[in-house]
Amino acid sequence: MENSYEETIDKRRVHLRPDTLRDPAPASLHLLPCEVPVNRPTPVGRFFTPAIRMGRDGLEASFRGRSLRGEEVVVPPGFVGYVVTEEKAEVLMGKQDDHERQEQELLEPPEALERDCDRFMGATASFSSFTVWGLESIPGPDAKLRGALSWPSLAAAIHAQVPED
Protein backbone atom coordinates (compact mmCIF):
# COMPACT_ATOMS: atom_id res chain seq x y z
CA MET A 1 0.00 0.00 0.00
CA GLU A 2 1.22 3.47 -0.82
CA ASN A 3 -0.55 5.40 1.93
CA SER A 4 -3.07 5.07 4.75
CA TYR A 5 -5.92 6.27 2.48
CA GLU A 6 -5.46 3.21 0.24
CA GLU A 7 -5.31 0.98 3.32
CA THR A 8 -8.62 2.43 4.51
CA ILE A 9 -10.22 1.78 1.12
CA ASP A 10 -8.81 -1.74 1.10
CA LYS A 11 -10.58 -2.51 4.38
CA ARG A 12 -13.97 -1.46 3.02
CA ARG A 13 -14.34 -3.95 0.19
CA VAL A 14 -17.77 -5.52 0.22
CA HIS A 15 -18.88 -8.52 -1.82
CA LEU A 16 -22.56 -9.10 -2.60
CA ARG A 17 -23.03 -12.84 -3.02
CA PRO A 18 -24.77 -13.34 -6.41
CA ASP A 19 -26.27 -16.70 -5.40
CA THR A 20 -28.44 -14.90 -2.81
CA LEU A 21 -30.08 -12.81 -5.56
CA ARG A 22 -31.58 -15.80 -7.38
CA ASP A 23 -34.78 -16.50 -5.44
CA PRO A 24 -35.10 -14.42 -2.28
CA ALA A 25 -38.53 -14.52 -0.65
CA PRO A 26 -40.81 -11.56 -1.43
CA ALA A 27 -41.21 -9.06 1.40
CA SER A 28 -43.76 -6.42 2.37
CA LEU A 29 -41.84 -3.23 3.23
CA HIS A 30 -42.85 -0.03 5.00
CA LEU A 31 -40.73 3.13 5.12
CA LEU A 32 -41.69 4.85 8.37
CA PRO A 33 -41.05 8.51 9.25
CA CYS A 34 -38.99 7.75 12.34
CA GLU A 35 -35.47 6.95 13.41
CA VAL A 36 -34.46 4.01 15.56
CA PRO A 37 -31.07 4.63 17.21
CA VAL A 38 -30.18 0.93 17.18
CA ASN A 39 -28.53 -1.14 14.47
CA ARG A 40 -29.41 -4.74 15.30
CA PRO A 41 -32.21 -7.21 14.68
CA THR A 42 -35.43 -6.35 16.48
CA PRO A 43 -38.98 -7.75 16.55
CA VAL A 44 -40.49 -4.94 14.46
CA GLY A 45 -43.69 -6.93 13.95
CA ARG A 46 -44.32 -6.66 17.67
CA PHE A 47 -44.47 -2.87 17.39
CA PHE A 48 -45.78 -2.27 13.86
CA THR A 49 -48.43 -4.55 12.46
CA PRO A 50 -50.27 -2.15 10.21
CA ALA A 51 -54.03 -2.18 10.02
CA ILE A 52 -54.03 -0.29 6.74
CA ARG A 53 -57.24 1.46 5.74
CA MET A 54 -58.07 3.15 2.46
CA GLY A 55 -58.91 6.77 3.28
CA ARG A 56 -60.25 9.44 0.95
CA ASP A 57 -56.70 10.71 0.24
CA GLY A 58 -54.83 7.39 0.27
CA LEU A 59 -53.63 4.81 2.74
CA GLU A 60 -54.07 5.39 6.47
CA ALA A 61 -52.62 3.64 9.51
CA SER A 62 -51.37 4.55 12.97
CA PHE A 63 -48.16 3.92 14.86
CA ARG A 64 -48.06 4.31 18.64
CA GLY A 65 -51.10 6.58 18.51
CA ARG A 66 -49.80 8.79 15.68
CA SER A 67 -51.70 9.07 12.42
CA LEU A 68 -49.80 7.91 9.34
CA ARG A 69 -50.70 8.63 5.72
CA GLY A 70 -49.05 6.66 2.99
CA GLU A 71 -48.91 5.49 -0.56
CA GLU A 72 -47.57 2.51 -2.44
CA VAL A 73 -44.36 3.19 -4.37
CA VAL A 74 -43.43 0.89 -7.25
CA VAL A 75 -39.80 0.12 -8.06
CA PRO A 76 -38.93 1.46 -11.55
CA PRO A 77 -39.55 -0.94 -14.48
CA GLY A 78 -36.69 -3.34 -15.11
CA PHE A 79 -35.43 -3.12 -11.51
CA VAL A 80 -35.91 -5.23 -8.38
CA GLY A 81 -35.36 -4.15 -4.80
CA TYR A 82 -33.46 -6.36 -2.37
CA VAL A 83 -33.22 -6.44 1.41
CA VAL A 84 -29.52 -7.01 2.05
CA THR A 85 -27.81 -7.98 5.30
CA GLU A 86 -24.21 -8.58 6.26
CA GLU A 87 -23.22 -12.21 6.63
CA LYS A 88 -21.17 -13.05 9.69
CA ALA A 89 -17.67 -14.46 9.20
CA GLU A 90 -18.42 -17.51 11.40
CA VAL A 91 -21.30 -18.49 9.12
CA LEU A 92 -19.22 -18.04 5.98
CA MET A 93 -16.24 -19.98 7.25
CA GLY A 94 -18.09 -22.60 9.25
CA LYS A 95 -16.22 -21.58 12.43
CA GLN A 96 -12.95 -23.00 11.10
CA ASP A 97 -9.60 -22.06 12.57
CA ASP A 98 -6.95 -20.43 10.33
CA HIS A 99 -5.19 -23.72 9.53
CA GLU A 100 -8.43 -25.46 8.49
CA ARG A 101 -9.46 -22.43 6.41
CA GLN A 102 -6.08 -22.37 4.61
CA GLU A 103 -6.39 -26.08 3.80
CA GLN A 104 -9.94 -25.53 2.52
CA GLU A 105 -8.76 -22.64 0.31
CA LEU A 106 -6.09 -24.90 -1.22
CA LEU A 107 -8.77 -27.42 -2.17
CA GLU A 108 -11.39 -24.85 -3.22
CA PRO A 109 -9.84 -21.42 -3.79
CA PRO A 110 -12.26 -18.51 -3.24
CA GLU A 111 -13.51 -16.70 -6.30
CA ALA A 112 -11.28 -13.83 -7.39
CA LEU A 113 -13.93 -11.28 -6.45
CA GLU A 114 -14.28 -12.69 -2.93
CA ARG A 115 -10.59 -13.08 -2.19
CA ASP A 116 -9.86 -9.44 -1.29
CA CYS A 117 -13.14 -8.64 0.46
CA ASP A 118 -13.48 -8.36 4.20
CA ARG A 119 -17.28 -7.97 4.32
CA PHE A 120 -19.89 -10.13 2.65
CA MET A 121 -23.53 -9.25 2.01
CA GLY A 122 -26.45 -11.41 0.98
CA ALA A 123 -30.02 -10.74 -0.14
CA THR A 124 -32.59 -12.00 2.35
CA ALA A 125 -35.73 -10.77 0.55
CA SER A 126 -36.88 -8.99 -2.60
CA PHE A 127 -39.58 -6.43 -3.36
CA SER A 128 -41.18 -4.71 -6.34
CA SER A 129 -43.03 -2.10 -4.29
CA PHE A 130 -43.15 -0.69 -0.77
CA THR A 131 -45.32 1.65 1.27
CA VAL A 132 -43.91 5.04 2.22
CA TRP A 133 -45.54 6.71 5.23
CA GLY A 134 -45.66 10.30 6.45
CA LEU A 135 -46.86 11.76 9.75
CA GLU A 136 -50.33 13.23 9.29
CA SER A 137 -49.81 13.65 5.51
CA ILE A 138 -48.62 11.68 2.49
CA PRO A 139 -44.96 12.40 1.62
CA GLY A 140 -45.03 14.83 -1.30
CA PRO A 141 -43.48 14.56 -4.76
CA ASP A 142 -40.45 16.51 -3.49
CA ALA A 143 -39.47 13.71 -1.13
CA LYS A 144 -35.85 12.53 -1.51
CA LEU A 145 -37.14 9.06 -2.22
CA ARG A 146 -38.95 10.24 -5.36
CA GLY A 147 -35.76 11.86 -6.60
CA ALA A 148 -33.77 8.68 -6.06
CA LEU A 149 -36.33 6.57 -7.94
CA SER A 150 -36.33 8.96 -10.91
CA TRP A 151 -32.62 8.39 -11.62
CA PRO A 152 -32.95 5.11 -13.58
CA SER A 153 -35.27 6.67 -16.18
CA LEU A 154 -33.14 9.81 -16.35
CA ALA A 155 -29.97 7.72 -16.85
CA ALA A 156 -31.68 5.70 -19.59
CA ALA A 157 -32.73 8.90 -21.38
CA ILE A 158 -29.25 10.43 -21.15
CA HIS A 159 -27.52 7.30 -22.44
CA ALA A 160 -30.05 6.42 -25.14
CA GLN A 161 -28.87 6.41 -28.72
CA VAL A 162 -29.78 9.61 -30.55
CA PRO A 163 -31.51 8.97 -33.88
CA GLU A 164 -29.83 10.45 -36.92
CA ASP A 165 -31.83 12.89 -39.05
From Swiss-Prot:
Any single Pfam family the record assigns to this protein: RNase_H2_suC
UniProt subcellular location: Nucleus
Keyword terms: Acetylation, Nucleus
GO cellular component, one term: nucleus
GO terms of biological process kind: RNA catabolic process
Keyword Acetylation: yes
InterPro entries listed in its UniProt record: RNase_H2_subunit_C, RNase_H2_suC
N-acetylmethionine: residues carrying this PTM: 1
Major place of residence: nucleus
Superkingdom assignment: Eukaryota
PANTHER family: RIBONUCLEASE H2 SUBUNIT C
Subunit and partners: The RNase H2 complex is a heterotrimer composed of the catalytic subunit RNASEH2A and the non-catalytic subunits RNASEH2B and RNASEH2C.
Family affiliation: Belongs to the RNase H2 subunit C family.
Known function: Non catalytic subunit of RNase H2, an endonuclease that specifically degrades the RNA of RNA:DNA hybrids. Participates in DNA replication, possibly by mediating the removal of lagging-strand Okazaki fragment RNA primers during DNA replication. Mediates the excision of single ribonucleotides from DNA:RNA duplexes.
The protein's name in its UniProt record: Ribonuclease H2 subunit C
Organism the protein comes from: Bos taurus (Bovine)
Lineage: Eukaryota, Metazoa, Chordata, Craniata, Vertebrata
